[in-house]
Each structure stands twice: as C-alpha cells, then as structure tokens.
C-alpha cells in the first residue's frame, strides 16, 4: 500500500472555511386567483411583473437566515390574472469565513443555492392555478450584488450640500 494518506484529521480542518445548509423552507406562500373562473375566458395576454428581494439576518453565532422574497403579479386588460407571493428561506452555518466574505456569500452564493427551489415552487403554484407554469429566468446574483454595492458606495461618497 502507498504511504500517501488523504484523510485529514479534525485538527487539520478546524481552521478551514466551512459553509453548510442547515435547512431550507417555505416561510410564506400565497397564490391568489381573484377572477376565477372568468379569467380562463380572457383573450388578452397578461403582463407579468416580478419583484425580487433578498433579506438576511443572523440567527445565532455563525448561523444566518437568508430569505428570497418574490412577488409576481399578472395583469390583463380585464383585471388581475393571478398574484403570487413567496418567501423562501435558507438557514446557513458559516464558520471560519473572513468577515469581509460573509456578506457576499449571503447575497450571492446563498441565493444562488436557493433559487432553483424558488423557481420550481413558483412554477408549480402558477400551474396549479390552471395557468402555464411561470419559468423565471436565472438571476445573476453576483452582478446584482456588485450593482447594489456600487450604488451604496456612490451614495456614501456624495456629500450633502452645505449652506453658504
């Protein structure tokens, strides 16, 4: 047998960055079909608006909750076709990660992990309302995060006008 041993002891890995998903779950789900059954006779194509938010909060030492909040509204000339609200959460344990890397993880990687589940739940909910499944396009969470941080940097660098 070869003398190479690839088994790392706990002492060797205790200082390495570790991230794990402790749980993921629907925190809130609402599907409204206020104009059924008349809506199924409407001929106009609905306009669909999607709003997306990410929220985070610490739950315990090294444990964070990440919430993906999605609000989908479909409207036609005749009225509201359907409305879906979903809050899907993940509980993440983050250990030995540098402090400056925690926020990017919570706003980029954690949502990227949760998004496929959000997409499926929304598609199933809309389909179960007797509409074609709503298939959300993939979201570039890294680009969104960079855009948000740039906007925050610009706002913090803008000095208020003083009085003369």
UniProtKB/Swiss-Prot annotation:
Gene Ontology BP annotations: protein folding; protein tetramerization; protein transport
Superkingdom of the source species: Bacteria
Keywords: Chaperone, Cytoplasm, Protein transport, Translocation, Transport
GO molecular function, one term: unfolded protein binding
Pfam families hit by this protein: SecB (PF02556)
Database matches in InterPro entries: SecB, SecB-like_sf
Main location, first listed in the record: cytoplasm
Cysteine disulfide partners in this protein: none
Subcellular localization(s) per the UniProt record: Cytoplasm
Any Gene Ontology CC annotation: cytoplasm
Family: Belongs to the SecB family.
Subunit structure: Homotetramer, a dimer of dimers. One homotetramer interacts with 1 SecA dimer.
Function: One of the proteins required for the normal export of preproteins out of the cell cytoplasm. It is a molecular chaperone that binds to a subset of precursor proteins, maintaining them in a translocation-competent state. It also specifically binds to its receptor SecA.
NCBIfam families in the record: PRK05751.1-3, secB
Name of the protein this chain belongs to: Protein-export protein SecB
Native species: Zymomonas mobilis subsp. mobilis (strain ATCC 31821 / ZM4 / CP4)
Name of the coding gene: secB
């Amino acid at each position: 047998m070869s003398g190479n041993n690839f088994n790392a002891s706990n002492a060797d890995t205790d200082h390495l960055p570790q991230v794990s998903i402790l749980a993921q779950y629907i925190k809130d789900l609402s599907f409204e079909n206020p104009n059924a059954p008349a809506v199924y006779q409407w001929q106009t194509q609905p306009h669909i608006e999607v709003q997306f938010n990410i929220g985070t909060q610490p739950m315990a030492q090294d444990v964070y909750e990440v919430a993906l909040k999605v609000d989908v509204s479909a409207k036609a000339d005749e009225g509201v076709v359907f409305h879906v609200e979903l809050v899907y959460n993940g509980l993440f344990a983050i250990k030995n990660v540098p402090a400056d890397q925690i926020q990017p993880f919570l706003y980029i990687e954690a949502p990227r992990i949760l998004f496929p589940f959000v997409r499926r739940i929304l598609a199933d909910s809309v389909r179960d309302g007797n509409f074609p499944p709503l298939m959300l396009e993939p979201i570039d969470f890294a680009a969104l995060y960079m855009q948000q941080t740039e906007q925050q940097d610009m706002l913090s660098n803008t000095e208020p006008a003083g009085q003369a």
